[in-house]
Structure formats: C-alpha cells, structure tokens
Amino acid sequence: MFGIASSLFELGGLIVMHDADGCNSTYDTHDEPRWYDTPSMVYVSGINEIDTIQGNDQRLIDNIAEAVEAAHPRFVAIGGSPMPNAIGTDFKAIERLVAARTGLPTLGFRTDGIHSYLPGAGGAYVWLAKTFLKAPHRKPQKPAKRVNLLGLTPLDFSVVGNATTLKQIVTDAGFTLQSSWSMGDTLDTLAEAANADVNAVLS
C-alpha cells in the first residue's frame, strides 16, 4: 500500500488507502517526507466496523467519486490494508466501478499492508506503463544516450539529495535523462519514457 502511494505520489492522481486510518495515517506524518513541500492527493478511506462486517464497498466508491469531482485528479489508485484483505475485498471490481463512474483511469490493487512495499510499487509502475506510456516517436540511438531511471522513490532513497545526485551522475556522464520513475517528474514526462534508449533500474 505504501509502495503504491510512494510511486504515484507526484503524478497528479487520487491515491486511496482503503483502511480504518489508525496506524496507516503514519504514511502522511512519517513515511512520506515529500509532504513538507510537495502537494499530493493521498487519502485514507476510513472504513468502519459496520462496512467491514457487511462488505459495504458503496461508501468507498461514493467517497472516491465525490473526491474526484472536488480535486480533478488525472487518475485514481486504490490500495488495500490488512482489514480489507482479511475480508477478501474485490479491488478489481471496485476498480471497474470507480472507472465507470468517474471516467478516469483507475488502479485497484490488492495490497495487504503487511508485507514489503515492493509489490505495490512495482504493480503501480506496471499499471502506469500499460495505461499512459505512448509509443516511441524517436529512433534508438547507438550508443545509447537517453536514460530512464526506474524505481526512484524516497522509501529507498529519501529526500536528502540522493535523487538529485543520481540524475547528475547520468547527465555528467553525457547521457540525457528521459524520465525519472518517479521523483521530480510529471505524468506527461513519464508517458514519453519509451523514447529512451536504456532503462536504469535502481535499488
């Protein structure tokens, strides 16, 4: 769940953590250092006991639709926590309902809030590529010149200058930075990532 939120944080989408709030509010206050200077739309759904017992997903869908009308995001992403995972919430069905109601590209991903953030971040990146990536309009260069940085989030690299340093290493070596997935870049720039000659995967 935190992986989805971190990888999509800067890209203009509405990101929903389907949870009762509680300890997962720490994403806002502790785990996401970009909150201090970068606006985003990351929310906790506030699922309650009755909704959990009855399997009521309608309130979540209604709240997302209301937030979309108010905030005008580029897309919607919904990730799960231990409670929805335990009751078998159908995130793909919610994805389809939200997409039909809002008309926006929507990701519903069954994260569980228990394991590593890597599957969530990776799944979000795959969805981004399938949904927004445009066909390349430049021919590959030999030797390679244009570089994508993949996997750049503060969960691994913090906000103490590491992202800037990595980008500087690329440009100082004579390469052109095509896109950064996903610190310091926009959704429109990421959509042009197929024009790169090589991907550098960061870990």
Identify the role of each PLM range:
Residues 1-203:
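An N-terminal assembly and electron-transfer interface module characteristic of large anaerobic redox
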